[in-house]
Amino acid sequence: MYFCDRNEKENLVMANFHHVVIIGAGPAGTVCGYLLQKHGVDCVIVDHATFPREKICGGGLTPKAYGLLQELMPDFRYEYQSVRRFKFMLEGKTISEVDLDNELRMVVRKDFDNELLQQYLSIGGKLVKGSFSRFEEQPDGKILVSIKSGEPLLCDYLVGADGANSQVRRQITGSRSYNTLWMEQYVEKGANEFIFELSKQYKKGYFFSFPSVGKDIVGMGGYYSSPKEIRAQLSKNHIRGNILAVDAPLRGSYIPLETLDSGKKQVILIGDAGGFANKLSYEGLYYAIVTGRNAWKAIMEGTDFSITNREIFRNKRKEAWVTDLFYSRFGLWLVRIGAHSPKLIKKAFEKCY
């Protein structure tokens, strides 16, 4: 059996050097990679999936999200369902219905993520199929990234954009960090309205119904530890009301909400890998896009991500205490009182998004 000597191993690694290695080809990683590639920075995205791939997500693009995406990628086109009607429910009863000034854009993540990736590839972006194993900081400051069943990669910056189950984050923290569980299913299209229901029975979460492209997505989530808990809650509140299809499968995903800075200038966590989902609404696409942009800025400027992403870290701290208040019994009481003013409900909803 032939073994490479040390010099050959070093040559192999150097042959696979990139200024930036991005783990994960979801929106956060692809936006970051697109901006780097567009500005002439050598980068590569690593992902284990074959695109297009399924993705569990409501798929809501808020005005902030699609506005920022338009600014960063003006040529990007994608299919979406426009929604302006918002129905707010409390304990199974409709308490307010409003028409939003700005549309919500509902996308199918399987298609949307693939279209984003194709946009990155169309400008010369590189994609490697493989699974992240671990990273090692080298004496010269570079980072050696091991890929399962693949050649190692050497880089100046490692960007962890590998989602809620991030292996990059897990290496840094030593454990998985899950806070909320969300489950959903596809049903036939109904009214073109966004339904949001709160209940004191729910664990810091809500029931939802989102119109999407060719179908609707319904489900619920919150601080639940297992699918069994959510299934029991849905059975009690919604299956009997014929909102969910009894024979359709429920798909689920955990979302980490503990925002994390890696503490290393050359290792950056973005999107769900960094715990950046909205702590109140649990929406993640805006924060995927904005943290992808902020990672690009940090790399281009040679500064810490904690600086370019300062405003987002500050927002996360604010969201934490607002969320605790909103989902408390006192918060639900305030919601009930405020429901008598549709203008107030509308303003609060648009403020969150």
Region spans (language model):
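Beta1/beta-strand and adjacent pyrophosphate-binding region of the FAD-binding site
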Residues: 15-26
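N-terminal Rossmann-fold NAD(P) dinucleotide-binding loop
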Residues: 29-30
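Glycine-rich FAD pyrophosphate-binding loop
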Residues: 37-56
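A conserved beta-strand/loop capping segment in the N-terminal third of enzymes
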Residues: 62-115
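Predominantly flavin-linked oxidoreductase catalytic cores and closely associated redox partners
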Residues: 119-245, 259, 275
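FAD/FMN-dependent oxidoreductases across multiple families
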Residues: 134, 152, 224-298, 304
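Active-site-proximal substrate-binding core of FAD-dependent oxidoreductases
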Residues: 260, 297-333
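C-terminal auxiliary extensions adjacent to catalytic cores
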Residues: 321-353
